[in-house]
Amino acid sequence: MYDNGPVFGRNDECWCGSGKKYKKCHLAIDERLNELWERGEEVLPRDLLKTSADLEGIRRSAAVNVGALDYVAERIAPGCTTGDIDRWVHEYTVEHGAIPAPLNYEGFPKSVCTSVNCVVCHGIPSDDEVLVEGDIVNVDCSTILDGYYSDSSRMFCVGEVSPERQRLVDVTRECVEAGLAAIKPWGHLGDISHAVQAHAEEAGFNVVREFGGHGIGIEFHEDPFVGFVGQP
């Protein structure tokens, strides 16, 4: 039997906190997880599942997160600095009752990550880094609201960019959309990774193998890790 925490009777209150009986809530899901485990599948632990209340809290956090990126979109232009972007994100986040998750996280000194041109990720904003016409910059924004985490990034083109850079940005967005389209109940993480990798390579690009996506919600970085290389 797959060991996924305490064992519940059919008429016990479900472990998820819904108040429903186990047989009316997560029993069928746990039975399916056990079947997969017995087949040799890697099964993620029960505590990664989010309750309805958790999901609503994460959505509220995500609304602030997206709003902060929209705030940047209204202001970013040639001549601004990545330090400006950091201040915009910080002020928007705080004004909406939230906390910038990166600030002081494992020593990170700023409220957002800004990665310009060839920087892959986790660039540190600076008042000395001035954006110029033709730059592309990734703004990686993470937000805590009422204890719930959200995390997203967005690519920005500064003024007019070269066709090559524009195509890179466009294909990257398409890769994200391909990965999202591959997500389905009882699917595999490899389905998502493969969709991202296949779309990138079909377009003539490569993926960064050392980094990937991750779970989020109750903590900043949760399992599972979602790589950009995989088999369906």
Mark where each language-model region is.
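Active-site neighborhoods and metal-handling regions in enzymes and metal-associated proteins
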Residues: 6-10, 18-232
